[in-house]
Amino acid sequence: MHTCCPPVTLEQDLHRKMHSWMLQTLAFAVTSLVLSCAETIDYYGEICDNACPCEEKDGILTVSCENRGIISLSEISPPRFPIYHLLLSGNLLNRLYPNEFVNYTGASILHLGSNVIQDIETGAFHGLRGLRRLHLNNNKLELLRDDTFLGLENLEYLQVDYNYISVIEPNAFGKLHLLQVLILNDNLLSSLPNNLFRFVPLTHLDLRGNRLKLLPYVGLLQHMDKVVELQLEENPWNCSCELISLKDWLDSISYSALVGDVVCETPFRLHGRDLDEVSKQELCPRRLISDYEMRPQTPLSTTGYLHTTPASVNSVATSSSAVYKPPLKPPKGTRQPNKPRVRPTSRQPSKDLGYSNYGPSIAYQTKSPVPLECPTACSCNLQISDLGLNVNCQERKIESIAELQPKPYNPKKMYLTENYIAVVRRTDFLEATGLDLLHLGNNRISMIQDRAFGDLTNLRRLYLNGNRIERLSPELFYGLQSLQYLFLQYNLIREIQSGTFDPVPNLQLLFLNNNLLQAMPSGVFSGLTLLRLNLRSNHFTSLPVSGVLDQLKSLIQIDLHDNPWDCTCDIVGMKLWVEQLKVGVLVDEVICKAPKKFAETDMRSIKSELLCPDYSDVVVSTPTPSSIQVPARTSAVTPAVRLNSTGAPASLGAGGGASSVPLSVLILSLLLVFIMSVFVAAGLFVLVMKRRKKNQSDHTSTNNSDVSSFNMQYSVYGGGGGTGGHPHAHVHHRGPALPKVKTPAGHVYEYIPHPLGHMCKNPIYRSREGNSVEDYKDLHELKVTYSSNHHLQQQQQPPPPPQQPQQQPPPQLQLQPGEEERRESHHLRSPAYSVSTIEPREDLLSPVQDADRFYRGILEPDKHCSTTPAGNSLPEYPKFPCSPAAYTFSPNYDLRRPHQYLHPGAGDSRLREPVLYSPPSAVFVEPNRNEYLELKAKLNVEPDYLEVLEKQTTFSQF
């Protein structure tokens, strides 16, 4: 039986068709989604898929590649979008190579901040034709060359703050003809080259936190006629004659153009004062002011100028997807949160991430409105730039702040320097809550009540230099949470309590130089971001790293000079810390005071091994100063000393603060010292030589004795000289007197030894008691040939003696009056002569040579006296005849050893030996060249005693 299929109902058919349609729709949606994603990825590029998130808004793509650890740009690819912002901050880029951005033609904003970029090679920015903003902040750039920014012809905003730039070449910005905003704050610029901004239409320039001392008008300021905002704070301005042109130029521009203050750093007499409050006479007191005045022409109108509000209301530049528009206000320099360095001037971030509008334009003004209320003893003016009242009460002999009547209404700046204020009370500043600057320098403040500044919550600068403050405590700075600059130099501070600076977390500059500090408590700088610290001229011997130095992580300047640093093991940690500082951070040298081997030496030039032989075991953190007891101050400080506005003594005058000596004066002083040293050395040399010669002369004089010369009556030996060629006079005992014979200088009678004085009974010829032996001690050194009677008789048999006449007594020598006293008072009494001898023949030497006795046996008074025939001459030693003309002397003394005494009249025949010896031919006397004295033998019947006394000869002591 045939059965039929059940019929399909209409309902089922509709259900089937609907199911099929849903499947097709789902498949189409999935396919469309896949195709859309693929198209999107292909449209933005690989950089948005793998490396960085991308966001499109208002037709601009923002590519966020921040903090991705990117080392090289080759790790990413350019996005495929017409206009985009590329954010590469917080990476590890250290160098930009040529043509690295050649494919990034769509970039309008490029963030390269917070990298480690040290160099930008020529052509690195080629391809960035559409770039309008470039951020290079927080890198390590040191130089901006002429070709650094080639290819950035459309650049309008350039930020290169927080680098180490010290040199900018003259044409570095020459091709940036559209540049309007230039941020160069917090670098190491000490000057700007001429014509740097000649072709740059700058409207905003930030030069804060550099090392600028001058800004010349010619070549620099004259090209900045379009500037509407200028920031020059935190530079060491030298308020001298050269700054008059800057003062004139600032007076000629809009009142609102200068944001902040130009505060004088030098000279010391103007330290801490605003340039607009210093007169030209104070800037240039001794020169013609007109030579330095360079007034630019006043702009006709301010049309097109964009005026800004003060720095306190400026916004921070941040990354944004908004398109850059010229009418919008450019942002200020930024700082990444992970960077320790901060802005010197506080800047409040804007609520939105875009650009804030410029403030409304104001009419060009050159005079400030008249202030409403001002204390009677002070002068006041209103500053339009910050809408604050400046109260100037300097040098008004004010003894108390309460004397200021009427009270100024909400002053912005108060100058109370050079007064007699001794105490700061808690009620002194109750009505000054808006105070931004308070200058109490160079007063007599020794006491500040606790929380005296508690109401000054907006105070940024506080000057307490040049007072008598001895101790710092946390209560002293209570309420100063906005304080950025604190000047405490030239006080008597000996102690800083722990936590003193906790109430001032925003402190950036701290001057503690020229105090009596010897230690710093642990954690004293905890929580601070100090940029500049001055500890010069204190009593520090070392500073611990742990708890003190290691907390100074944001420093851009520190001064440790002129402290008695003890360069031993305790300072090794500080040395290592100093060596890790970047170039330019340490202001001056760190000179060792002890130990002596390192004195006046820079600590950095000494190896750690020399400072501490076992420095590897030394802990980097030296003992904390809390354990060091601060002794009483060693130097007395006179309370009546007046200090000038810098805190230095007022007696120093304009240049009193300069401790260095001018180079010309130093060179002249060194030259004078050198010349004096030469003269002193020459004088000492001459003195030493004279003393040496005197000592030698004294030694010679002690070995000399005076011997009197005398004339002896004698007869000339016969013969005319014999065959020997040497004439010997033959003595005749009878016959006519012969004329005087002139003997040579070496005749024996000119050589009279000292003991001849004993032939006379005059006491002047006697030897002094106790020196009878010493007088003849050196006789053997003369080596004079002598012979006894016994030897002569053996050599030649004398002729039979003639009849001897009656012997005449020996002649008595007479002294001139005063001769005895003269001999007693002087050792050198007669011209000095040298005695030369010739070695005698060995067969003529006497066997009786003795150092303790004088010549013996020379002329023995024997009984066998004989005469020598006429014409017969002895070969060497002629014997004296026993004639009346010959004298035989019998000594009346006995020559003994040193322990014996002389006794006249001794009976021993040995003692009757005469002291006169026969003349050896080898003995002669040579007079000195300075004196000439020829002794002549005279043939007289009686001796000439006056001539005997005049002709004296000095011989070496025997």
Curated annotation (Swiss-Prot):
The subcellular location is: Membrane
Say if the entry is tagged with keyword Cytoplasm.
no
Under InterPro entries, the record lists:
Cys-rich_flank_reg_C (IPR000483), Leu-rich_rpt (IPR001611), Leu-rich_rpt_typical-subtyp (IPR003591), LRR_dom_sf (IPR032675)
Mind naming one GO cellular-component term on file for this protein? Answer: plasma membrane
Q: Where is the LRRNT domain positioned along the sequence? A: 365-407
The UniProt record lists the LRRCT domain at 235-286, 563-614
Q: How is the protein disposed in the membrane?
A: Single-pass type I membrane protein
Residue ranges, Cytoplasmic side: 686-958
Q: List all Pro residues biased stretches.
A: 797-812
Tissues/organs with expression: Expressed predominantly in the cerebral cortex of the brain but also at low levels in the spinal cord and medulla.
A Pfam family name for this chain?
LRR_8
Lineage in the entry? Eukaryota, Metazoa, Chordata, Craniata, Vertebrata
Sites where a glycan is attached:
N103, N644
The residues forming the signal peptide are: 1-40
Q: By what name is this protein known?
A: SLIT and NTRK-like protein 5
Chain segments annotated as transmembrane: 665-685
Source organism of this protein record: Homo sapiens
Gene Ontology biological process terms from the UniProt entry: adult behavior; axonogenesis; chemical synaptic transmission; circulatory system development; dendrite morphogenesis; grooming behavior; positive regulation of synapse assembly; regulation of trans-synaptic signaling by BDNF, modulating synaptic transmission
**Which of the residues are on side Extracellular?**
41-664
